[in-house]
Amino acid sequence: MDKKEKRPTVLFFDSGVGGFSVYREAKKLLPNWHYLYCFDNAGFPYSERKEESIIHRTLAACQLINQRYPLDAMVIACNTASTVVLPPLRAAFDIPIIGTVPAIKPASEITKTKHIGLLATKGTVKRHYIDELIDKFAQDCIVERLGTTKLVEIAEQKIRGHSVDLISLKDELSSWAGMADLDTLVLGCTHFPLIKDEIQLCLPQVKYFMEPSAAIAKRIKYLLDDKNLQAQNEKYNQMFCTAHFPEESQFKKALHLWGFESLEVIKID
């Protein structure tokens, strides 16, 4: 098959469905590519797991999928996983592997008040690399950090068809409600763009929401344009998870809205 007839196959990996925020930007920019999405719901949430477990589960899932669908690129659409899995993944795969990094640099450039909020998982806000990003790009800013698992759960419920509990959301963000000059918010978890409108309702003083999805989509395009492709011309976009879940039948009915044809359970334990 001529390489011009092939579409790049790109895998998005996350512990949940937060990576949809990254996937949708890629699909918007590159609508005809072949996309795979795997969420490790059996290991969710990664913010509560040890680094060794995150590395093991990510490697196992990605290797299993790559055996069936030779990948041209991989996106770790999870901030928590990106802090630990990129070196072992790059050692195991000879393809571009793109991580997700909180958009602290662009936030520091756009803020007018020099007061930034970093909203991420509990694991991410404590990582040393966050200290390094702030020291490198935002030394002249006050950077508030809020680590939350609750917002991840709220976003998961929204994507599965449930309404957002604004009372719980407002309560989780209450420590920032009185910060009138907090004008920029870094959405440091891929789940959070999925509930950006609801977050805005709770924090009306925030003018700028920064997250890396669009930049990641452009990076994928740059890395794979005009490259020799491994993947065959697969027709359908596929989704994988690692355990059955209560709303699975309802979730499957909504897959086509995101451009996927099927959901398959894979075992990685």
Swiss-Prot record:
Substrate binds at D14, S15, Y46, S47, N79, T80, T190, H191. Pathway: Cell wall biogenesis; peptidoglycan biosynthesis. The active site is at C78 (proton donor/acceptor), C189 (proton donor/acceptor). It comes from Haemophilus influenzae (strain ATCC 51907 / DSM 11121 / KW20 / Rd). The keyword Cell wall biogenesis/degradation applies. This is Glutamate racemase. Provides the (R)-glutamate required for cell wall biosynthesis. GO terms for biological process: cell wall organization; peptidoglycan biosynthetic process; regulation of cell shape. The keyword Cell wall biogenesis/degradation applies. Its EC number is 5.1.1.3.
